[in-house]
Protein backbone atom coordinates (compact mmCIF):
# COMPACT_ATOMS: atom_id res chain seq x y z
CA UNK A 1 0.00 0.00 0.00
CA UNK A 2 1.24 3.51 -0.75
CA UNK A 3 2.47 5.79 2.04
CA UNK A 4 -0.19 8.38 1.18
CA UNK A 5 -2.89 5.77 1.75
CA UNK A 6 -1.39 4.94 5.15
CA UNK A 7 -1.22 8.62 6.01
CA UNK A 8 -4.85 9.18 4.96
CA UNK A 9 -6.10 6.23 7.02
CA UNK A 10 -4.09 7.33 10.04
CA UNK A 11 -5.34 10.92 9.60
CA UNK A 12 -8.96 9.74 9.45
CA UNK A 13 -8.42 7.83 12.68
CA UNK A 14 -6.51 10.65 14.40
CA UNK A 15 -9.24 13.21 13.72
CA UNK A 16 -11.36 11.50 16.38
CA UNK A 17 -8.45 11.61 18.84
CA UNK A 18 -7.40 15.27 18.68
CA UNK A 19 -4.78 14.49 16.04
CA UNK A 20 -3.09 11.75 18.06
CA UNK A 21 -2.46 8.20 16.92
CA UNK A 22 -0.87 5.43 18.95
CA UNK A 23 1.14 2.49 17.66
CA UNK A 24 -1.66 0.24 18.94
CA UNK A 25 -4.16 2.24 16.85
CA UNK A 26 -2.06 1.71 13.70
CA UNK A 27 -1.97 -2.00 14.43
CA UNK A 28 -5.76 -2.05 14.98
CA UNK A 29 -6.41 -0.47 11.57
CA UNK A 30 -3.94 -2.86 9.93
CA UNK A 31 -1.17 -0.38 9.23
CA UNK A 32 2.37 -1.58 9.93
CA UNK A 33 3.66 0.27 12.99
CA UNK A 34 6.92 0.99 11.16
CA UNK A 35 4.95 3.34 8.88
CA UNK A 36 4.48 5.76 11.80
CA UNK A 37 8.24 6.16 12.06
CA UNK A 38 8.54 6.65 8.30
CA UNK A 39 5.86 9.35 8.33
CA UNK A 40 7.62 11.04 11.25
CA UNK A 41 10.96 10.94 9.40
CA UNK A 42 9.30 12.69 6.45
CA UNK A 43 7.79 15.35 8.76
CA UNK A 44 4.19 14.33 8.06
CA UNK A 45 3.50 13.38 11.66
CA UNK A 46 5.25 14.33 14.92
CA UNK A 47 6.68 11.77 17.31
CA UNK A 48 5.37 12.80 20.76
CA UNK A 49 6.43 9.89 22.97
CA UNK A 50 7.10 6.18 22.73
CA UNK A 51 4.30 4.78 20.55
CA UNK A 52 2.49 8.14 20.34
CA UNK A 53 2.35 10.49 17.34
CA UNK A 54 0.39 13.61 16.39
CA UNK A 55 -0.72 15.27 13.19
CA UNK A 56 0.17 18.88 13.97
CA UNK A 57 -1.78 20.16 10.97
CA UNK A 58 -4.95 19.35 12.94
CA UNK A 59 -5.78 22.44 15.04
CA UNK A 60 -5.27 22.00 18.79
CA UNK A 61 -8.21 22.03 21.20
CA UNK A 62 -8.50 22.45 24.95
CA UNK A 63 -8.84 18.66 25.23
CA UNK A 64 -5.45 17.79 23.65
CA UNK A 65 -3.48 17.95 26.87
CA UNK A 66 -5.90 15.58 28.62
CA UNK A 67 -5.91 13.09 25.75
CA UNK A 68 -2.12 13.20 25.45
CA UNK A 69 -1.64 12.63 29.18
CA UNK A 70 -3.81 9.50 29.16
CA UNK A 71 -2.24 8.24 25.91
CA UNK A 72 1.31 8.72 27.26
CA UNK A 73 0.50 6.59 30.31
CA UNK A 74 -1.35 3.97 28.24
CA UNK A 75 -2.95 0.75 29.42
CA UNK A 76 -5.87 1.32 31.78
CA UNK A 77 -5.01 5.02 32.22
CA UNK A 78 -7.78 7.51 32.89
CA UNK A 79 -8.14 11.10 34.07
CA UNK A 80 -8.73 11.37 37.79
CA UNK A 81 -9.26 13.93 40.54
CA UNK A 82 -9.04 17.60 39.65
CA UNK A 83 -8.14 16.73 36.04
CA UNK A 84 -11.72 15.49 35.56
CA UNK A 85 -13.08 18.73 37.01
CA UNK A 86 -10.72 20.76 34.79
CA UNK A 87 -11.80 18.77 31.71
CA UNK A 88 -15.40 19.87 32.35
CA UNK A 89 -14.43 23.35 33.58
CA UNK A 90 -16.00 22.64 36.98
CA UNK A 91 -15.09 24.08 40.36
CA UNK A 92 -12.80 26.79 39.01
CA UNK A 93 -9.86 24.39 39.20
CA UNK A 94 -6.79 25.00 37.10
CA UNK A 95 -4.31 22.31 38.12
CA UNK A 96 -0.69 22.66 37.07
CA UNK A 97 -0.54 18.91 36.45
CA UNK A 98 -2.93 16.52 34.74
CA UNK A 99 -3.65 13.66 37.14
CA UNK A 100 -3.82 10.30 35.44
CA UNK A 101 -4.97 7.22 37.31
CA UNK A 102 -3.72 3.74 36.52
CA UNK A 103 -3.53 0.43 38.31
CA UNK A 104 -0.14 -0.46 36.90
CA UNK A 105 3.40 0.72 37.40
CA UNK A 106 4.49 3.31 34.85
CA UNK A 107 8.12 3.20 33.81
CA UNK A 108 7.96 5.75 31.01
CA UNK A 109 9.61 9.12 31.53
CA UNK A 110 6.68 11.51 31.66
CA UNK A 111 6.68 15.29 31.41
CA UNK A 112 6.35 17.18 34.69
CA UNK A 113 2.82 18.26 33.77
CA UNK A 114 1.57 14.66 34.18
CA UNK A 115 1.08 13.20 37.68
CA UNK A 116 0.41 9.49 38.13
CA UNK A 117 -2.11 8.34 40.75
CA UNK A 118 -1.98 4.61 41.46
CA UNK A 119 -5.61 3.53 41.73
CA UNK A 120 -7.89 0.73 40.66
CA UNK A 121 -11.43 1.95 40.15
CA UNK A 122 -14.55 -0.19 39.85
CA UNK A 123 -16.14 -0.13 36.40
CA UNK A 124 -18.96 2.06 37.75
CA UNK A 125 -16.47 4.86 38.47
CA UNK A 126 -14.93 4.78 34.98
CA UNK A 127 -16.30 6.37 31.83
CA UNK A 128 -15.18 8.34 28.81
CA UNK A 129 -15.75 12.06 28.21
CA UNK A 130 -14.91 13.62 24.85
CA UNK A 131 -13.29 10.28 23.87
CA UNK A 132 -10.92 10.49 26.84
CA UNK A 133 -10.97 7.67 29.42
CA UNK A 134 -11.86 9.21 32.75
CA UNK A 135 -13.09 8.66 36.26
CA UNK A 136 -16.69 9.81 36.62
CA UNK A 137 -17.40 13.33 37.80
CA UNK A 138 -18.93 11.87 40.98
CA UNK A 139 -15.67 10.02 41.74
CA UNK A 140 -13.66 13.17 40.97
CA UNK A 141 -15.74 15.29 43.35
CA UNK A 142 -15.31 12.68 46.10
CA UNK A 143 -11.55 12.57 45.56
CA UNK A 144 -11.22 16.38 45.58
CA UNK A 145 -12.94 17.01 48.93
CA UNK A 146 -9.62 17.50 50.72
CA UNK A 147 -7.94 19.57 48.00
CA UNK A 148 -10.64 21.85 46.56
CA UNK A 149 -12.54 24.38 48.69
CA UNK A 150 -16.07 23.28 49.64
CA UNK A 151 -17.60 26.43 48.13
CA UNK A 152 -16.03 25.62 44.78
CA UNK A 153 -17.11 22.00 44.97
CA UNK A 154 -20.70 23.09 45.70
CA UNK A 155 -20.68 25.18 42.52
CA UNK A 156 -19.08 22.24 40.67
CA UNK A 157 -21.84 19.92 41.90
CA UNK A 158 -24.60 22.24 40.68
CA UNK A 159 -22.85 22.87 37.36
CA UNK A 160 -22.26 19.13 36.88
CA UNK A 161 -25.96 18.46 37.51
CA UNK A 162 -26.93 21.20 35.05
CA UNK A 163 -24.63 19.62 32.43
CA UNK A 164 -26.06 16.14 33.03
CA UNK A 165 -22.87 14.81 34.62
CA UNK A 166 -24.51 14.02 37.98
CA UNK A 167 -27.94 12.65 38.82
CA UNK A 168 -30.35 14.55 41.05
CA UNK A 169 -29.68 12.03 43.83
CA UNK A 170 -25.90 12.52 43.52
CA UNK A 171 -26.36 16.29 43.59
CA UNK A 172 -28.42 16.08 46.79
CA UNK A 173 -25.93 13.71 48.41
CA UNK A 174 -22.92 15.89 47.59
CA UNK A 175 -24.67 19.10 48.64
CA UNK A 176 -25.60 17.57 52.01
CA UNK A 177 -22.03 16.35 52.58
CA UNK A 178 -20.36 19.57 51.47
CA UNK A 179 -22.73 21.91 53.28
CA UNK A 180 -22.27 19.83 56.42
CA UNK A 181 -18.49 20.05 56.06
CA UNK A 182 -18.51 23.81 55.42
Map each language-model feature to its residues:
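Short gly/ser-rich loop at a beta-strand->alpha-helix junction or flexible surface loop bordering the NTP-binding
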Residues: 2-9, 15-139, 143-182
Amino acid sequence: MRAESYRRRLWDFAVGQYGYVRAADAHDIEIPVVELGKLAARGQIRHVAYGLYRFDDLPPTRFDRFFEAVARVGGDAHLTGDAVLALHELGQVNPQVVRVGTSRRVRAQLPKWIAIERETLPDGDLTSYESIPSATVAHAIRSCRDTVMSDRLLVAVDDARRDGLLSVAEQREFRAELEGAG
